[in-house]
Amino acid sequence: MCAKIRNLIAVFCVLVVATAFQQQYFRVVPRSLRVQEGAEAVLECAVANLAGQVQWAKDGFALGFSSVIPGYPRYTMFGDRRHGVYNLRIVNSSLVDDAEYQCQVGPAQMHKVIRANASLTVICKYSILSRFRTPTKLVK
């Protein structure tokens, strides 16, 4: 009887530990956006079971863990850290912002690194149209 109770307790403990520990994962995966030049762009990212630090990268260049991003005055990382929300806001978007972005969550304890990509396409406000003229014949 004692052996059965010990086995039952052991199974129960394993189940509790297995359900209590879940890997961090994206609750909201960043989605690609198309914005007009000058508009605000918000790339969303939300993480469940957050354990690691979160940052955004632009074309492979890490932007850092702070909400204020050095060298990028139009960029801010904002959201609700308690709920794992780390959105990237770009104000007055320009053609230099047209890039591939990645929400990155670092490793911690037994949690693995996770990454999710989204592209930002900035549409030029003004397009230049050119007309091709056919040469005119001179009549003498």
Tell where the protein language model's regions lie, with residue ranges.
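N-terminal Sec-dependent signal peptide, specifically the hydrophobic helical h-region
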Residues: 1-31
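N-terminal V-set
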Residues: 22-24, 48-76
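Solvent-exposed strand-loop boundary residues in beta-sheet-rich modules
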Residues: 60-62, 81, 109
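Well-ordered beta-strand positions in beta-sheet-rich domains
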Residues: 32-34, 74, 115-119
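Surface-exposed, proline-enriched loop/turn segments that connect beta strands in immunoglobulin-like
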Residues: 28-32, 130-135
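Solvent-exposed loop/turn motifs of extracellular immunoglobulin-like beta-sandwich domains
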Residues: 3-10, 35-44, 51, 81-85, ...
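Extracellular/luminal immunoglobulin-like beta-sandwich modules
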Residues: 55-57, 100-125
